[in-house]
Amino acid sequence: MASRPGFLTDWPWTPLGSFKYLLLAPLVFDSIYSYATIRDHEKLLIVAVTVWRIVHSQIWISLSRYQTAKGTKRILNKSIEFDQVDRERTWDDQIIFNTLIVYLTKVYVSGTSTIPFWRTDGVILVALLHAGPVEFIYYWFHRALHHHFLYSRYHSHHHSSIVTEPITSVVHPFAEHIGYTLILGLPLITTFMCGTVSVVSIALYLTYIDFMNNMGHCNFELIPKFLFSLLPPLKFLCYTPSFHSLHHTQFRTNYSLFMPMYDYIYGTTDECSDSLYETSLEKEEEKPDAIHLTHLTSLDSIYHLRLGFASLSSHPLSSRCYLFLMKPFALILSFILRSFSFQTFVVERNRFRDLTLHSHLLPKFSSHYMSHQQKECINKMIEAAILEADKKGVKVMSLGLLNQGEELNGYGEMYVRRHPKLKIRIVDGGSLAAEVVLHSIPVGTKEVLFRGQITKVARAIVFSLCQNAIKVMVLRKEEHSMLAEFLDDKCKENLIWLVGDGLSTKEQKMAKDGTLFLPFSQFPPKTLRKDCFYHTTPAMIIPHSAQNIDSCENWLGRRVMSAWRVGGIVHALEGWKEHECGLDDNSIINPPRVWEAALRNGFQPLLLPSLET
C-alpha cells in the first residue's frame, strides 16, 4: 500500500479475493458457446492468451526464485519477507483487467469481428510505435510518478519492494494501471484504427511486455556480455535486470520502460549501471553452510513449493478446492520432475547470523518412499547430494521428512558407514525433536498414552518419560488382543496422547473430550475431533534475526521450522563435530544440550493449542 493511498488505489474486485476469477467465467462460457455455434475462434484466443500470460509469468516466478536461491548472477543479496509476498499476491489483477478490456472491445466495438491472423505491416508498426511514442511517454509519466504528490499516493506501493521478483513489475495501484494501459495500448489502438491490427500482433505485443517486465525485475542477470559487444546499439534499446534494479535501490535514476536510450538522452542513467551489470554476471553459485534436504509430500505440494505459487507457499500446506481442478497439471508436473530430475536442487535460501542456509528438494513424493522399487533410487540421490555438499565444503546436512527413514537408510547412518571420511556432518534432528515433544507435555502430567510407529524419536521420548517417573501406556496392534479391555477403559481417561504414524480414526474416537494429541512424527495426524486439542509436529519458532523467510515449511505456520531442520541449524551454529544419525547410543546428542543450544540461539517453542469457544 502507498504511504498515503490516493483515489482508485484498490482494484474494483479487491473484495472478491480469490473469487475474482469468476469475473472471467462469462467470457469463458461465451467464447465456448460462440465457437460451438458460429465458429468464432477469436474469443477462444482471448482465453488462450490469458492462460498463456499467467503461465508465462509463473515460469518467470519459478525461474527467478530458483536462480536467486542458487546465487548465480544474483543482483541484490537482500531478503524478501512475507509482507512483500502478501503485497504482491495481486500480480494477476492486471491480466484480468487487460482480458476484460480486450473482450469488451471485441464484443462492443465494430470492426473487431474480422481481425486477420497475421499482417506484417501491423507487426512492424507496433514495434515502431512502441520504440517511439510509448517509450517516450512512459519515461515522462514515470518521472511524474516520482514527484512527491503522486509517489506518496500511488507509486510508493511499487517501490515498497527493494528486492524485486518478476511479479513486482505489475504490482501497482489500480489508477496507475489505467495510465499504463492507455500508454501501452497506443500501438494496438493505432493499428486497429489503421486497419493493420492482427491476432499475432496483439499476442506478441502482450507477450513482449510481460517478458520484458518479468526479466527486468527477476533479480538475476541473464543477458550475456557478448550481445552488447556484437551489437553496441543494443545497450540503448534493451535494458538489463541490473539496470532496472538500480531504479529500485536509487529511486531517481533509470526511469526508462524497456529502452534505456531516454535515460541517456535526459541524463538520468545511474553511473553504476555498467559496473553492477558486470559484477552481477561474475557472481558464482553460493556455498551454503548448512543444507536441509526435504521432499514433496502430496501431489498438491508441488504448488506449495517456494518455486511454485508464491501465494500458496507463503501459507501452511492445506487442501484447497480449486487445486482439485488443477490435478491434471499437477500430474504433468510430477511426471516432468520424475523424468528429468535425477538429483536434488535448491528451493530456498535463508540467512541467520553468519550462516547461509539452503533447503534442497529431492523430487520424490511421500508415496515413493513406501515403494521398495524406489528406495535404491532415493538412497542414491541422497548419497549423491551428501557427497556433492561435502565436496563444496558444506558443514551440515539435515535430513528432513522421510529422507531419514529407518528402513531407508537407518536415519542416515548408512551414508556415514559408506563414507567414513566425510567432513560434512549428517544430522537427523531426532534429539531436538524429542525435546520439543517433551517440553510440550503440560507440567504435572502423570501418565501419557503412546500410539504410533516406534521411531528413534519415540524411543528417546519414552526413555526420558520413564526416567522422570511418568507412566507411559502403550497401545499397539500386536498388543491389542491381550490388552484390549484394559486399554480401552484406560484410554478414555488419558488426556495426553503421544501419537505418530499409524494412528487410526477408530483410535482417535477412543480419546476423551479435551484430549491433547502431541505428534512425535514427521507428519501430523488427521484432525478429526473438534473437541480435542491437536498440537503441530515437533517445530520451533525461528528468531527475528533469520532473514529471507518468505515461505512456509509444509503444514507449519509462518516463521516456524520443523525440529529436524532446526536441529541441523543449531548443529552448524554450535560447530559440533559429531554426526547425529543412526540408532546406537552415540547417534543421539545429549537432548537437553541441544534444547538449551536452540533456546540460546533464539529459537522458541510453540504454544500449546486451545479449543475454540
Swiss-Prot record:
| A single Gene Ontology CC term | membrane
Q: Which organism is it from?
A: Arabidopsis thaliana
Tissue-specificity statement = Not detected in any tissues.
Query: Which superkingdom, per the lineage?
Result: Eukaryota
Transmembrane region(s): 13-33, 44-64, 95-115, 122-142, 182-202, 322-342
Q: What is this protein called?
A: Protein CER1-like 2
Question: Which cell locations does it reside in?
Answer: Membrane
What's the main place this protein lives? membrane
Q: What GO MF terms are annotated?
A: iron ion binding; oxidoreductase activity
Q: Which family does it belong to?
A: Belongs to the sterol desaturase family.
Q: Which UniProt keywords apply?
A: Membrane, Transmembrane, Transmembrane helix
Which biological process terms from the Gene Ontology are attached to this UniProt entry? lipid biosynthetic process
Q: Does the keyword Protease apply?
A: no
Membrane topology recorded in Swiss-Prot or TrEMBL:
Multi-pass membrane protein
Q: Where is the Fatty acid hydroxylase domain?
A: 134-268
